[in-house]
Amino acid sequence: MDRLTRILAALTRWGLGLCALVLVLMALYVSLGRELTPLVAEYRADIEDKASAALGMPLQIGELEGNWSGFAPILLARDVMVGSGANALRLDQVRAVPDLWASLLAREVRIAHLELNGLKISLKEAEDGTWALEGLPVQKDQPLDPEQLFNRSQMIQQLSVLESQVTLQPLDHPPMTLTYVGLNLKTGASRQRLDARLTLPDGQPLALSLRTRIRPSQLRDSTVEGYASLPQSDWSKWLPERLTQQWNFSEIKAGGELWVNWTEGTLQSAAIRLNAPQLTGAYAERKPIQINNLALNAYYENSARGATVTFDSLAMNVGETRWESRVQVQQTRATDKVEELWHLQADRLDLTPITPLLNALGPLPQGVATAVERLKVTGGLRNVLLDFRPNATDGTKFGFAANLDNVGFDAYHGAPAARNVSGSLSGNLDGGELRMDSKDFVLHLDPIFAKPWQYIQANARLTWKLDKDGFTLIAPYLKVLGEEGKIAGDFLIRLHFDHSQEDYMDLRVGLVDGDGRYTAKYLPEVLSPALDEWLRTAILKGAVDQGFFQYQGSLSKNAGEADRSISLFFKVHDAELAFQPGWPHVSKVSGDVFIEDSGVRILASKGQLLDTQVSNVFVNIPHVPAGQHTHMYLDGAFAGGLGDGLKILQDAPIGTGETFAGWEGAGDLNGKLKLDIPLAKGEQPKILVDFKTANARLKLAEP
C-alpha cells in the first residue's frame, strides 16, 4: 500500500512538473513570437521574392507588418499588387495566419487563414458570347489544370474575401456592379465549403452556400450541395436582351430559395421556393400582361429510370382570377424494351386565364396565336394526362386525356362554338374522342345559324381525326333536352388546311314532343331576310309532334346556293299562326311545315280562323332569285259564318276596309280562298274567293 502511495505521489509530481514545463515553454513561445513578429517588416523584399516565385508572377507589397494573436503569428500586408499590366490584382489589405505546425510537418508553407480585402474584378462578355475575367492575373500560355489548382488550394485551410466588388458587363447592356462581396472558403482533402454574400445594385442581399466533395482525380464523381437565397428584387433591369430574347419584361419582382444536389456529373435533386409579387411582360410586340402573387414550390428528383419534376404548389393571380394547380412531369429513359416517354399529370387546369397568358407570353406562330385569341377557351380541366414520345414518328408522339369541366370556346374557321362542355376527353395526334355529359349546354354552328342553341341537358359522343389535309369532327350520337323538346342528331364537319378547298358540314337534327315557339332557332342564316322574318313571327305557339332539320354543304358565308342543301320539317298540332300582320290569327292548326331549298310549304289539314273552320290549307313560299320579292301563296277551304267573312274584309290589309265598312251579316258561309301576299312591305295582296252562303242575312251601311 505504501508503495502504491509513493508511485502515485511521484506521478503527480512528474505530471505537475511536466505541466509547468509546458506552460513555461508556451509562455516562452508566445513571448518570442510577440518579440520577433514585428521584425517581419524588415523582410518585405524577401517575402515578395518568395511569393513571386511561388505564384509565378510579380508581387508587390506596399506595407508589411506582423503581430501576434493567441498562439499564432499574423502577417498584415497593405496595398498589395499581384501581377502586372491591366489584369494586375490590387488588394487594399491581405491578412495571413500561418499554420506553423502544419508547415513544419509538410516542410512547406501552410496558411491557416488567408483574408483578402478590397478585391475588385469584372466579368466581360465578348461578341462571341464568351466571358472573360478581368482584374485577376493569369499566366500566359498555361492552360488551367484543375488538379494543380486543387493541390495549390490545399496550402490554405480557409480563404476569406471581404469588402470586395464584382462587375458584370454583358454585351449591349449596362454594367451591373455587385458590392460588399464577401465569401469564405474552407478547403480540405475531401470536403470543401463555400459561403458567399453580396449586395445587388438595389441594396438587397443575396446569399450562396456550397458544400462539395471534390477529388481532382475523380472530378466526375464529385458531389456538390448548393443553396441560394434570392431577395425580392426587380430582376428585369438586370437581364440582358440576349437572355430574354424576344420577351420584353418591364418588371420581374421575385425572390425565393434554391437547393441543388449534384453528383456523378448530373443533377440528382433540386428544390425551389419562389414568390413573385409582380411580373409584367409580353412576347415581341404583343400587349403586356401583369401576373401578381406568383407562388411556386417545385422539386426535382433523378433516378436510374428517369427524372421527376413536381410542382407541388403553383398559383398566381391573372387579373381578378386566382389560378392554382399541382403538376408533375415524369421522364422515363429509353431502354432496349421501352422508348423514351415524358408524362405530365395535373389535378386541375383553369383554362380561362391561359388564353391571355398565351396571347401575351406564348412564343406561338402567328397562325396558332390567332387561333388561341379567336377561340377564347374558358372552363377547366381535371385529371389531366399528357404523354410525349420524342422518338415516335406516328400519331402516338403526343397523347392526352382529361375530364372537362364547363369548357367553352368561340367559333373559329368553320368549327362550332360551345359552352359548358363537360365530360371526358382522350386522343392523340391522329384523333380522339369526347364523351359529353353537360348541363346548360350551348352550341353555335356559325355561320349557318345566327344565334347559339341552348339546351338544359346534352349527352353526346364526338370523335375527330387529324391528317395532313385537314381536321374531321364527327358526332355519331348527340342527344339533348331543351325547352323546345327532346332532340337527337348527328353531324360531320370537315375543315381543310388548304383554304382554297371548301369546308363542309353534314348535320341532321330530330325533334319529338317539342314546343313550336322555339322552332325559329333552327332557321338557317341562308334564308332571305323577308322569309326569315315571316317564319320567325308567323309561328306563335303549338305542339311539335316531330321535327327534322338537315344541312349539307359548305361552311363558308360566301358560298353559293348550289354549294349547300337545307331541309327543315315540322309536324305540328294546336298551333297558332300569324301569317300576315293585320290578319286574324289561325289557331288549332294541325299540319306539316317544310322548309327546303325550293322554298317553304305548309300543309294544314285543319285550323280555325276566328269562328270559321279552315281545312286543306296549302301555303307555298317559293324561293326567288336575289333582288326579287318573296310572295306567299295560300290556297284553302273554309266553312263558317258570314260575320267572320265580313270582319276579315273590314280588318285585313287587303284594301277592302272602306268598301265593307259598317256591313253586318249572319248565316253560313262556305268556299275556297286563294291569296297572293307579298312579304315585302308596300305591295298590295291579291285575293280570289269562291264562296256560297246559306240562310244568310246581310245589312248594308249605305244601301
Label the model's feature ranges.
Residues 2-6, 57-58, 74, 78-187, ...:
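Secondary-structure transition motifs
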Residues 3, 8, 12-18, 22-64, ...:
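Extracellular/lumenal and peripheral-membrane lipid-interaction modules
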Residues 26-128, 206-209, 213-221, 251, ...:
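Terminal hydrophobic membrane-targeting helix
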Residues 44, 116-119, 137-244, 251-253, ...:
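Elongated, acidic membrane-bridging lipid-handling scaffolds
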Residues 58-62, 85-98, 111, 172-183, ...:
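Amphipathic hydrophobic-ligand
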Residues 64, 80, 94, 114, ...:
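Solvent-exposed loop/turn tips at the surfaces of repeat/solenoid architectures
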Residues 98-104, 262-264, 333, 388-392, ...:
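Outer-membrane beta-barrel proteins
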Residues 198, 295-314, 434-448, 452-480, ...:
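Strand-loop-strand
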